[in-house]
Amino acid sequence: MAYDGKVLRQATLRFDEDKQRRQEQQRQRQQRVYQQCPELESIQREIRGTMGEIIASALRRGTDPLPAIRVIRDKNLSLQRRRAELLAQLGYPEDYLSEKPRCPLCGDTGYRGDGLCSCLKKYYAQEQIRELSRMLDIGSQSFDTFELDWYSPDRGSLPRSPRENAQRNLNLCRDFAARFRPGRENLLLFGAPGLGKTFLSACIARVVSEDGFSVVYDTAGHVFSQFESAKFRRDDDGDTAGEDVERCMNCDLLILDDLGTEMTTSFVQSALYQLLNGRLLAGKSTVISTNLDPEELGRRYGAPLLSRLEGEYQLLPFVGMDIRRLKREQG
């Protein structure tokens, strides 16, 4: 699983801040106890000192360290018993002064072996939702709130009615999100504006990110401007753009919205092919939303890209009346 560096930094920062807050709360608890019973502070200091004595005895040359270590151990145990007695007199459990990690799996380091611990993964998922919420209304949008009633049930000359087609798209998107694995599938959502493409994209982003995968959502126009900045600039803007390009290339799921609304140039054609082909080769998944049908995409971006889309993406056409306009007209 790939982690978004930007999101991981934010998650780690919050993780460390919460850890420091807990440590400060523990320090304050200790100070309150020491004010009630100064002897406890002295005992704590002596217990910490015995650890240094054991190390010094073990390193001392020319003598057998075991007898000295046994004496120090007995002293340490005696101090612990006295500490427990004093704490009990004050009404506290015997481990009240000990720093207890919130996560028993990693000891609050956030890592287990070479990977993230589940505790840090929770922070990562929360930060990713926050990052996606800056561009998508994922808080209120879910597969369960997708309203099929706005789509006509009349087939006319179509093999499916707009409502049947919307139901099919909903089922496919829900299944894509529920069974998501990087590189398993790619989706191309295409059709006129206002038919639910961005809504379903947001639903996919929400479910996949909550499952712990890295998700980047962006508009095609902004992505291509970042590609251009990374290629031609050498200032701070170029550095930031380069990081954004890496995020788009390496995330588990890229959701590329509004493809076709940008100014299409030869550079954009090249950047789009590089992005999509690179992600396919790396085993990463992509969801594309566009107002253009496959034939129009081929004319605008070239036959090689169209071949990639038709061969590697599941095509989901959206048909019907502009739902945003219908909602406005009905007040």
What are the functions of these language-model segments?
Residues 2-14, 18-44:
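Short, charge/polar-rich alpha-helical segments
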Residues 69-104:
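Short, charged low-complexity linear segments at domain edges
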Residues 90-141:
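Interdomain "pre-motor" coupling segment immediately N-terminal to P-loop NTPase/helicase cores
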Residues 139, 143-187:
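Pre-Walker A (pre-P-loop) alpha-helix and adjacent loop at the N terminus of AAA/AAA+ ATPase modules
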Residues 153-169, 187, 209-250, 266:
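Short glycine-rich substrate-engagement loop in P-loop NTPases that contacts/grips substrate
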Residues 183-200:
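Walker A/P-loop nucleotide-binding motif
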Residues 185, 213-214, 250-253, 282-288:
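Loop/turn-to-beta-strand initiation segments
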